[in-house]
Regions:
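Positively charged n-region of N-terminal signal peptides that target proteins for export
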Residues: 1-4
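Bacterial N-terminal signal peptides
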Residues: 7-15
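Sec/Tat signal peptide C-region and signal peptidase I cleavage site
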Residues: 16-21
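Double-stranded beta-helix
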Residues: 27, 31-32, 37-43, 49, ...
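N-terminal, post-signal-peptide region of Sec/Tat-exported proteins
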Residues: 40-74
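Conserved short histidine dyad/triad with adjacent acidic residue
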Residues: 44-46, 91-133, 166-169, 188-190
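A short beta-strand-loop-beta hairpin characteristic of the jelly-roll/cupin
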Residues: 125-127, 131-133, 138-159
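Ligand-binding loop in jelly-roll beta-barrel domains
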Residues: 145-147, 154-156, 167-191
């Protein structure tokens, strides 16, 4: 009951639907001292509002490659949008619908709430939600629809679509009527 009340309050404050504000369950397995497979963590992940209409939940973060197998939980670290140097970030991001009037009011200097790794190579930003991370990203649209803006074009994506993004300037805008949920795996990369 407490989770439902918290989700309802967060939904109202951040412009999300109650369904979008629900936490996701994460199950992490590992090995015990006998080398038997066990469940290390099985819990709902905390909801983390990122900006009005956007929530992000980190499931796992690593700092090196190959990543160490660990029994500690690295998901609560505050690291920003990009993965750590030589690391990875596994997350889900929810995007609430953004109507044209609200989109027009986004301040040009917003640049995804101050992400410092945007834009690439001095290319002017065409939208306040444009940003860039020095990472190779695998993404899958889990539900809803969204537009991925690039420097010279936009691509409309729907549930089930997969994206492989190679450190490009981009932005996400949900012009639909329903929230959009995207699964991301970000891996630190080297500049071309």
């Amino acid at each position: 009951m407490k989770r439902l009340i918290a989700a309802t309050i967060l939904a109202a404050v951040f412009g999300l639907t109650a369904a979008q504000a629900q936490e996701m369950r994460r199950v992490v397995t590992g090995l015990d001292d006998r080398n038997h497979s066990v469940v290390l963590f099985d819990s709902a992940m905390p909801l983390k509002p990122a900006a009005p209409g956007i929530t992000a939940t980190n499931f796992w973060i690593t700092d090196s490659y190959p990543p160490p197998l660990t029994t500690s939980d690295p998901s609560g670290r505050q690291i920003g949008t990009a993965p750590p140097d030589n690391g990875t970030k596994f997350r889900v991001v929810d995007f609430a619908p953004l109507d044209a009037a609200a989109e027009a009011k986004l301040p040009p200097e917003m640049i995804m709430r101050g992400i410092t790794n945007a834009p690439a190579r001095g290319i002017p930003v065409k939208h306040p939600l444009m940003h860039r991370t020095r990472s190779l990203d695998y993404a899958m649209i889990l539900s809803g629809e969204i537009d991925m803006m690039l420097d010279d074009t936009s691509v409309h994506l729907k549930s089930g679509d997969v994206i492989v993004q190679q450190a490009t300037n981009h932005g996400w805008v949900n012009h639909g009527a329903q929230p959009c949920r995207i699964l991301f795996v970000l891996m630190d990369s080297k500049e071309p």
